[in-house]
């Protein structure tokens, strides 16, 4: 389960502003490691996962088709797309952004989720963890409660959950609360330190 780095828009609006407008660096990126190609990691996900495992990949509309195609080419079976309803809107040039895609794959044989009555629209408020100055630790942080829904549906107690792009550790916190073992990987040392502190 992961929220990999992908191309983001500056989300400019009709007034010329944008969520990430002031955070884009000289390379035109919002984050230091913004443009990791999914063809580099999708085959590795498939290699390390057990047969029957579920795989959740979060993305936006810009990268949806590419990620879907690459994961299928890597051997995954696409089950369906889920929607994360953030319960808040971000002003854009056209329609306001309120949701993100969660692509739901499996490796090998089909295994049902644990709670078959779960809706494919997951309404979880988009809250950010902030530092002492009120600044977001991570601008694309995913809520722990959202991760708990996915983990609870696709694993049992003491199973191992992998998040290769763990950011500031929401998946790890969810695993801790649900009695799952967790393997988290993060290349950005600032985020890695924050994740360790949050999971301590």
Label every model-predicted segment.
Residues 1, 6, 10-24, 70-200:
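Class I S-adenosyl-L-methionine
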Residues 30-87:
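Conserved Class I SAM-dependent methyltransferase catalytic core
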């Amino acid at each position: 389960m992961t929220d990999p780095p992908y191309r983001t828009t500056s989300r400019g609006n009709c007034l010329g502003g944008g969520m990430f407008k002031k955070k884009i660096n000289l390379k035109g990126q919002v984050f230091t490691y913004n443009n990791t190609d999914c063809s580099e990691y999708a085959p590795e996900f498939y290699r390390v996962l057990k047969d029957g495992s579920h795989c959740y990949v979060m993305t936006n509309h810009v990268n949806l088709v590419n990620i879907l195609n690459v994961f299928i080419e890597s051997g995954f079976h696409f089950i369906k797309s889920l929607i994360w309803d953030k319960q808040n809107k971000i002003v854009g040039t056209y329609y306001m952004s309120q949701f993100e895609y969660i692509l739901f794959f499996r490796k090998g044989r089909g295994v049902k989720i644990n709670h078959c009555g779960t809706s494919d629209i997951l309404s979880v408020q988009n809250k950010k963890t902030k530092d002492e100055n009120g600044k977001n630790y991570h601008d694309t942080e995913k809520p722990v409660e959202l991760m708990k829904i996915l983990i609870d549906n696709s694993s049992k107690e003491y199973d191992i959950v992998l998040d290769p792009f763990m950011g500031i550790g929401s998946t790890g916190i969810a695993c801790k609360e649900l009695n799952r073992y967790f393997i988290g990987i993060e290349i950005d040392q600032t985020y890695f330190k924050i994740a360790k502190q949050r999971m301590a």
